[in-house]
Structures are given as structure tokens and as C-alpha cells.
């Protein structure tokens, strides 16, 4: 008789304790289920998203994990807790290093804190997790952002030029290498001239490489 049924009352304390107990015992799926019950009632609770996110990552649900990390971080930022949001995204970068949005959002928050150098480091750190041909587009985007923050950082520009060449954007790679050559010196210039020659093995490129070898 349906009219006799009663919905189970929302017992927040019971659910929290049950989820914590399940997590402690390694019962991740049970903990996730309990946290989801809580989130069904409190969808914007940053602390609940922070608790469930690593469990989702550990159970190979990266998209759901990132959604929770992002939601929690955004909520903290809206409340003025930018430093806590940075800490949360740092945790996300450990669990989800191959989620490019993690690095982009983390860099955004470092810029919000006026920490340009840290934002640049974050983008380069993220780039290192995208090494394969399949990931090349993510690496290129991160490097373009890093280049905007440090236009004359040699490693950023040199790496970007190499990836552009591999991606088939040889014209852009050549232009970037020529730009680097205009302000770099010595050993770095030799590397630039060598890469220019590899891209365009012309007499002019060969002469530029030779001159860098002799004069550098």
C-alpha cells in the first residue's frame, strides 16, 4: 500500500559518519553512494565535493572527480577563499594530472592572487604530463598560455616551437624560432639554429647554424 510508505528522513549526521567509516575501511563505492545522498540535498556544499572527489578519482571516474573538484573550488572562490581553492586544485592535480583544465584553472587562481611566476610554473608543470602525440594539443595550449606570461622564457618558447613543428604548423614554428633567435644568446642560440636547419635545411639556415657554432 503506497500511501503507507514514508520517505526515509534526511539524516545528515548518519550519512556523514557512514561515509567516513566506509572510506576508512576502503569501501570507496559505498562511501561515494553515501556522499551522493548528501549532495542530492546539498549540491553546492564545497566540503562534500572535496570529500567525494578523491574517491571518484581513485575509482577511475576522472570526469566526475574533476566536476566535484571544480565545483568545490569555484564555491570557495565565490566565498573569498581563494587560497583554499588553490590547495584543493593542487590536490586535484595529484589525482588528475592528465586533466588539462586542472592546470588552466590553477593558473587562473594564481594570477588572481597576482602570482605570475607561480602561474607560469603551474602551466609548465601541467605541460609535462602531456607528452604523447595524442596529447600534443593540450601541451601546445598550455605552452601558449605560459608564453603569454613569460614571453622571453627560452624553455617555454623552444618547447612550443618543437611541438608546433611536430603538429604540422611548420610556418608558425619557423616564425617562433626566428623570434627566439633575435633575443637569445650563446648555447641557446646554437640550439635554435640547429632546429631551424632541421626544419628548413637551406644554405641560409646552414650558415646561421655554423655561425652560431663558431661565434657561440
Protein language model regions, located:
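Repeat-based scaffolding regions
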Residues: 1-216
Amino acid at each position: 500500500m503506497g500511501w503507507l510508505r514514508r520517505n526515509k528522513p534526511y539524516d545528515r549526521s548518519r550519512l556523514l559518519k557512514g561515509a567516513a567509516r566506509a572510506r576508512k575501511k576502503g569501501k570507496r563505492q559505498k562511501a561515494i553512494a553515501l556522499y551522493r545522498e548528501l549532495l542530492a540535498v546539498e549540491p553546492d556544499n564545497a566540503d562534500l565535493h572535496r570529500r567525494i572527489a578523491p574517491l571518484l578519482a581513485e575509482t577511475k571516474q576522472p570526469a566526475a572527480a574533476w566536476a566535484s573538484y571544480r565545483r568545490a573550488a569555484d564555491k570557495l572562490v565565490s566565498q573569498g577563499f581563494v587560497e583554499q581553492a588553490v590547495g584543493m586544485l593542487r590536490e586535484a592535480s595529484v589525482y588528475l594530472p592528465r586533466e588539462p583544465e586542472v592546470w588552466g584553472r590553477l593558473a587562473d587562481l594564481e594570477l588572481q592572487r597576482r602570482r605570475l611566476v607561480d602561474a607560469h610554473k603551474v602551466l609548465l608543470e601541467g605541460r609535462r604530463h602531456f607528452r604523447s602525440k595524442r596529447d600534443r594539443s593540450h601541451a601546445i595550449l598550455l605552452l601558449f598560455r605560459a608564453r603569454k606570461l613569460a614571453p622571453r622564457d627560452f624553455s617555454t618558447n623552444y618547447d612550443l616551437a618543437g611541438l608546433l613543428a611536430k603538429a604540422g604548423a611548420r610556418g608558425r614554428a619557423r616564425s617562433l624560432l626566428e623570434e627566439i633567435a633575435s633575443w637569445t644568446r650563446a648555447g641557446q642560440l646554437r640550439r635554435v639554429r640547429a632546429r631551424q636547419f632541421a626544419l628548413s635545411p637551406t644554405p641560409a639556415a646552414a650558415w646561421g647554424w655554423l655561425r652560431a657554432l663558431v661565434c657561440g
